[in-house]
Amino acid sequence: MDRIKKLLNTKKIAMITCYDATFASFLEKNQCDVILVGDSLGMTIKGHKNTHDVSMDEIIYHTKCVRRGAQKKPIISDMPIHSYQSKKEALKNAKSILNAGADMVKIEGDEDVYEIITHLVKNHIRVCGHIGYTPQKIKHFKKNKLEFLAKAKSLEVCGISMLVLSKTGAEVDRLITENINIPTISFRSSGECNGEVEILYDLLGLSNNLKSAYDRTIRKDSMTLKNPINNFIKKIKR
């Protein structure tokens, strides 16, 4: 748990998703603070349109891969959809994820998961919350800053160690970050949180769904990745 204590005291947290040992080793050697084994692997690895086909076995498999590559780096792993529908099931699955090498699990939701999170924390499982856009539920949300603040405070009372704010906007991010005592992590939202999380394959420009201005900046920065591949192909084709 020393890894997590150090992470929680980091002023600006850089979190990046990862699913394999090679990239995990690369991230550990560079300045990434924490690796997220995200259920985004449903899209990036499996080629599905969403996260709904990711299983517990797959999260465990990829968590083990990442831990082999990054033995000293804090790892947070998503609890996939349908893996925390009861307290008993959630605790069993969370323990399996931690046994695979994770230091913390991430759970999407608010009122619907308060009891689950409280139960996990009481059983010494560290939990990262996730509100705003929640891919497992794929539902639209109202950007009411006071409602978001109330949800964040309730999750803090439940015992979460950190909180991901997904596409909630700068005003909401700032309000929550200033009014809770745990680190906040922004996803595609603002620079107003204690840190940011990004999908590795998007950073590398490998995703096919990079459409926003932010995404286009990522793609521009990643153009150099094509050079070694293109050079190899050109050498063979001479």
Predicted ranges, named:
Residues M1-R238:
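Alpha/beta enzyme core
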